[in-house]
Amino acid sequence: MHQEPHVLNFGKAGNGPTITAGMALAIEPMITRGSAKTKVLADEWTVVSVDQSRGAHFEHSYAICPDGRPFVLTSPDGGKAELARFGVEISDLLA
């Protein structure tokens, strides 16, 4: 379903792949109330915590536009309202 590059939700800045214009990224953080250790079930899709604690998962899809700025494909306003709080300007795809 997803293509390269595989970008982890954790790590040190500057050590992963370079994100460039033309990429589409699925950002999929997961959190659990207990152990951070997880396993994938036999269906090769379902992820559970090893201690069976409750968890949550959500996804947003981003396009990196030709101007190098992001556009959130899963947000009606392209992510403008939420990303502005962090000083991030989105691409002008809605203009």
Residue ranges, per PLM feature:
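Charged, cofactor-coupling segments
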Residues: 11-95
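Short, basic/aromatic beta-hairpin or loop at an interaction surface
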Residues: 1-6
